[in-house]
Every structure is written in C-alpha cells, then in structure tokens.
Amino acid sequence: MGVSMRDGVKLAVEEINKSGGVIGRKLQLVERDDEAKNERGVQIAQELINKEKVTAMVGYINSGVSLASQRFFQEAKIPVMNNVATATVITQQFKAQPENYIFRNSAADSIQAAMIVEEAITRSGYKKVAILADSTNYGQLGREDLEKALTAKGIKPVAVEKFNIKDVDMTAQLLKAKEAGAEAVLTYAIGPELAQIANGMTKLGWKVPMIGSWTLSMANFIDNAGPGGEGARMPQTFIQQADTPKRKAFIDAYLKTFKPKNNRIDSPVSAAQGYDSIYLLAAAIKQANSTEGPKIREALENLNAKVEGVVTTYDKPFTKTDHEAITANIPVLGEVKQGRVVYAYAEDMKKGGDLRVKDAKAAKK
C-alpha cells in the first residue's frame, strides 16, 4: 500500500508541476520509507523537519507510526496530511492544542467499523460474529471500534481473537470462532496475515464470510488468499473503475506510468488518496500564497476553491475543529471478485459516477 500511495502522490506532483507548479514554484518530493516501524518513523520525521526543511508532509500508512511520529510535525507547525492511516484518534491526538496541524483524507476506522457492522448485522442478518485483529495499534484500535459499533447494535462478538504480524497459522483463532458458532468473521489487520485467515478457513473446511477493514482490498490479501479470498467485503473510498472522466484519466495515467501486473493497482485506495492529498495541500499553499506552516494550516481549514480529486470533489473539507475530509456517506462496500475489488452492490455500481461529497452535518456530530 505504501508504494501505491507514493505512486499516486508522484502522479499528482507531476501533473501540478507540468501546469506550472504552485505560487510560481515546482513541488519537490522528498521520499522516505518508515518500514512500518515506529522508531524509524520518528527518525525520519526529525530528518524531514530539521535537515530537509519540508513545507508539509503527506503519508503514513501505518497508524502506529503516525501516532508515534506526527508529534514532531505538530511541534514544528508543519501540516501533515494522513492519506492512508485510519486509526480514529489520529486527527484528535492534538485536538486540545490551540492549533492542530494533523489532517486526514482517508476514512477513519470509526466510519469503517460502522460500515462493517452494518453489512454483517443489518444487511446480512448475522447474529453471531467473531473478530480477528492483529496485535498492532491499527488492529487493536480497530477492534475497539468494531466492538463499539457492535454494542450499538446490541451485539456481543462470540469470539475476539488476536494474532501477530508474520503469523502463518490461524487455526487456533479460527477454531475458537467456529466452535463459538460464528456466522461471519470481522477482521482488522494490516498485512498478508489476512490471507492466512482465508487460507485457514479453507484448511478447516469452514467457509463463512470475511468482512473487514479496507486492507482486505490489497493485492497481498487477494493474491495470497486466492479462491479463499473470493467474496471478502470491505469499505472502499475508491474502486478501480473509470466512473468519471477524472477517475479514468487517473487510472489510465497510473497504468501507463507504473505498469502494474494485470493492469491492477495493488492498492487503489492508497493510490487515489495519495493523489488527492497532494491536490488538497497544493490548493492550500496556493490560497495561502505561502509555504509557511501556520498559513497552510489556516488555508486548509478555510479552503475557498473546490478541489477535484478522484475519491471525491472536496468542498470545504476541513474546518478549525474538523480535520477529516471523509464522512460516512463517501465510502462504499467493495468485494473481492476474480482477483479484483469491485462494487459489492449493484446500486453502488450504478451510482459510481455520482459525486459523493462530504456530509457537513454528519461532520459536526
């Protein structure tokens, strides 16, 4: 997902620079890989601030790395646009401070958890569900969001199981879920371990629906799970389908530039959100007519011009008290089908070209 996000960012930077840049200057991209390690993220943050003197930061794939590292940008008054990390608390980490420099254009876990539970309990009618989550900050914070969403529906999970990164055998966790009578497995995890859940079900001869966070859409799940991953469902802010001219242009440019295998973006959500994050920051820099952090933050909180992205068109996506660009009405449910993620519901596919914009009323709740 990190490479897909970076490539989406690169596309946006290239487009903006070809059209003259921002406030008379070309955007310069400084890339670093935090390796999904908190300590590496901290080191990189200090390097980008003190050595590279960056104007703003886009990225963070891993919620744990974001929560450990973004405080340095907050202290330096440099805006951060979280474009993939989804832990609910990310934009709230410094909410009590007079100025909050942390923004996001990915769907928070509180939104995703509610969608997962809505799909499992309300739409599908399951009464018994199990939760399998990894031991990372992302997995455990997501599990908490799932349990809250289930409680709101009057449901208690029949099993709540944890696993570690790089675990290859989920038999023990799956047996507990099966023995408890789970009708569906709800997942929250960041990596290829998700495929081990699907493969474990196949080995046990026990096939129940997998419904989980957006990471079920990633190539490392789809490819490693094979037939066992078919039918898995997850929230998606972006599906690789040319519903609109803007999305078609983005997809065509991505495929032409990066030539992914089978013309499939490994993580379409990451690529799209990476792309949009640059356009949001560029709009703020242009409005501020400055590269000073406080002025960019203020512009982000009061964007005058609409920003056409591939996830949505952003119309005043942020305010001083709301730093989330995505509200619950924007994501749709995706489903793994024949090695790709497609719309889970025909009605969503039919409306794919319709613009789903931020719900200002929902944002204030």
Where are these predicted regions, by residue range?
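Extracytosolic ligand-binding ectodomains
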Residues: 1-365
